[in-house]
């Protein structure tokens, strides 16, 4: 094991999923595990599903200053990553699962999250046409949000291929409750969530500027996106339905073949056979993205549906995928595209 990693924010859902993946990585040794609110607690008290970490104890994030780890993962709440990153040596690679360094426009950051913008890092979505070389050459990588991951992987090929109009994109995406983190809030209690679907932050969700940023780069111009997130009664998973007004000549075959060609050879993206639509359960526990697309002649819109595990490809799995690229390791090391069923 030639690579040592440290994790800040290791007690949350994203941090716990990252630890599970790191334990299975053939080249990685797990170093310091920081979690300010859980400092001093045994790791297995917080994550009883990780018995191989028996005997390990969470430290305070301040203990990471001057770390000799090869890479540090920041799995902290939004707005907290920048302060920890500033204490780390420039020689240490850092992958930030939070939002602090995703956005290029400081004003967009202030509108979405409040406070001062901490600067922009390389955007870590390897399947984007321009991304792999940028990630591999970077020491600081911002891991995308879960909704932007699912949405971008559906719409980017259609924008690059000129199949949809950039000015008319609509996304409705449902997410499980773990996307909101581990903090206890009334609206996330089981008795509140079970048997219920509800839209939230309609027109104001903090991920919309991130979605717009990525899709605009793909289109080569500023896009317009309507984004409606939906809270679903399941622990994890995202199902995103993304549509765009089709350009002349676009049909169902063109949409499908564009997606298939864009992701040919990708280890984690599966364009499903025609007529088979993505299920969130099929991606559970993996780093997979399941994709299907078609064209609706009644409305003249191209439609793409994507499913991911929001804690996998939407967070920890993607972070490890980027870390592998940053460290010069096989991109798929410690990861799987296989899900867990039922």
UniProtKB/Swiss-Prot annotation:
Provide GO CC annotations from the record. Answer: cytoplasm
The record's catalysed reaction(s) read: N-acetyl-L-glutamate 5-semialdehyde + phosphate + NADP(+) = N-acetyl-L-glutamyl 5-phosphate + NADPH + H(+)
- Keyword Cytoplasm in annotation: yes
User: What biological-process terms (Gene Ontology) are attached?
Assistant: L-arginine biosynthetic process
Q: Which Pfam families does the record cross-reference, listed alphabetically?
A: Semialdhyde_dh, Semialdhyde_dhC_1
Q: What is its main location?
A: cytoplasm
Q: Where is the active site?
A: 146
Keywords, in A-Z order: Amino-acid biosynthesis, Arginine biosynthesis, Cytoplasm, NADP, Oxidoreductase
Q: What is its biological role?
A: Catalyzes the NADPH-dependent reduction of N-acetyl-5-glutamyl phosphate to yield N-acetyl-L-glutamate 5-semialdehyde.
Instruction: Give EC number(s), comma-separated.
Output: 1.2.1.38
Q: What is this protein called?
A: N-acetyl-gamma-glutamyl-phosphate reductase
* Similarity annotation: Belongs to the NAGSA dehydrogenase family. Type 1 subfamily.
Q: Which gene encodes it?
A: argC
User: Which Gene3D superfamilies does UniProt cross-reference here?
Assistant: Dihydrodipicolinate Reductase, domain 2, NAD(P)-binding Rossmann-like Domain
Q: Give the InterPro entries listed for this entry.
A: AGPR_AS, AGPR_type-1, NAD(P)-bd_dom_sf, NAGSA_dehydrogenase, Semialdehyde_DH_NAD-bd
What are this entry's molecular-function GO terms?
Answer: N-acetyl-gamma-glutamyl-phosphate reductase activity; NAD binding; NADP+ binding
